[in-house]
Amino acid sequence: VLDACIPGKSQIDTICQLNFELAEHFAAAALKLIERAGFKRGEVDLIGSHGQTVWHSVLPDGTVNATLQLTEAAVLAERTSITTISNFRARDIAAGGQGAPLTSYLDWLLLRHPDHWRAVQNIGGIGNVTFLPPLSDAVSAPMAFDTGPGNVLIDAAVTHLTGGAQTFDRDGMMAQSGQVDAEWLESLLQHPYYQRQPPKTTGRELFGAEMGVQLVADGQQRGLTPNDIVATLTALTAHSIADAYRRFAPAPPGEAIVYGGGGSNPALMQMLR
């Protein structure tokens, strides 16, 4: 799937096949979830599938003009016999939106606090946040946008530095064993994306494996060890998230809920705290 996201590695026949194969896996997962939850298929009204993004085209001015997600909805519908809704991102872009992040409406429905603002932070490949007003606030609107790289640069660096022996920093061990290069970190935080006002979205097209490999080379030129490089890129994710809160939060959140793979990285979580 990751190769399908990289120009020069992706092939149209692979993308075509993945579109159906991913749907088979998603259908099996949906059926397993229904069973574990104690429901029958006929009791489920619908399945919503946003698919697997392989390309999200963001222009220099921040406008999103195209996007492509895999996971064939027809396969999901056939395998589960449940009405399936898809193409959420494409519809949002067609209506003039950014196509991401998509979780903000579900966050709004399920995760508002009775009395204070709450931040819901995903740290997947890319980080995104939803700022939610409290239930007691009937006036304020939520805000959601991509904060920048989540795990993507860390994973790319670890993969490159270990020759593929590791594809992510398990338990944050490399970051915890390294030293953050504060001067380099400060320069990395000057990327124009971080200053751009929401609504905004980004992806592997900007913060991707190619950038990760280049940053490894930059770190090596600075005389940094592999652990120092990973520590600094981990700090980049943490600081870009914290800076986004300081700059753009409609109100100071009383708490943050963190999910995604980054939430299982002790080094990253410690930096965020």
What is each PLM-predicted segment?
Residues 52, 125, 261-263:
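Active-site metal-binding loops of divalent metal-dependent hydrolases
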Residues 25-33, 226-252:
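Phosphate/ATP-binding catalytic cores across multiple sugar-kinase/actin-like superfamilies
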Residues 58-67, 78, 82-166:
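Phosphate-binding/catalytic loop of phosphoryl-transfer enzymes
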Residues 1-16, 139-142:
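Short glycine-rich, Thr/Ser-proximal phosphate-binding strand/loop in the N-terminal lobe
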Residues 40-43, 114-116, 225, 249-254:
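Short helix-loop-beta connector
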Residues 133-135, 147, 156, 239-273:
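Catalytic phosphate/nucleotide-handling subdomain of diverse soluble enzymes
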Residues 9-70:
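Short beta-strand-loop/turn "lid" adjacent to the catalytic site in phosphate-handling enzymes
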Residues 139, 143-238, 242:
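Conserved ATP-utilizing enzyme core subdomain
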